Amino acid sequence: MFDVSFTELMVIGVIALVVIGPERLPKVARTIGHLLGRAQRYVNDVKSDIRREIELDELRKFKNEMDETARSMQTSLRETEDTLRDSTQALRAELDDTARDASKAVNGADAPAEPAPAVASDTDTRSIAPPAAATPADKTPPTGSAT
């Protein structure tokens, strides 16, 4: 971490022993150990916070990309919907025109300029039809009274 060799640590220990003294050196060493532990935890916390921020930043970028994609899809869907609506309206208008034209043609055919000849009734067809064949009861031989 600090790139300190073993000999440098020995020199620092001897100087601390001379300056602080043998009675207070263990207490100072314990305090320095606690401070170094806190410093390491703080550094680790900062590292994890930085990692978390990087991950959150990546997630934000991903979220922004997804939002942008969703917006473009909505725009595309609206454009497609508008195109379909316009096509449907054009087809309806064309069908309405065709229906009007067909209605005019049918109404024009219903009212001809000359009236059609009257259709013969059922009684008229009987008078035109040939007489019915005689039934077997009618074909009895004549009796002798008819001489």
From Swiss-Prot:
It is a single-pass membrane protein. The Tat system comprises two distinct complexes: a TatABC complex, containing multiple copies of TatA, TatB and TatC subunits, and a separate TatA complex, containing only TatA subunits. Substrates initially bind to the TatABC complex, which probably triggers association of the separate TatA complex to form the active translocon. The lineage of its organism: Bacteria, Pseudomonadati, Pseudomonadota, Betaproteobacteria, Burkholderiales. The keyword DNA-binding does not apply. This is Sec-independent protein translocase protein TatB. GO terms for molecular function: protein transmembrane transporter activity. The gene is tatB. GO terms for biological process: protein transport by the Tat complex. Residues 109-120, 129-147 have a biased composition (Low complexity). Keywords: Cell inner membrane, Cell membrane, Membrane, Protein transport, Translocation, Transmembrane, Transmembrane helix, Transport.
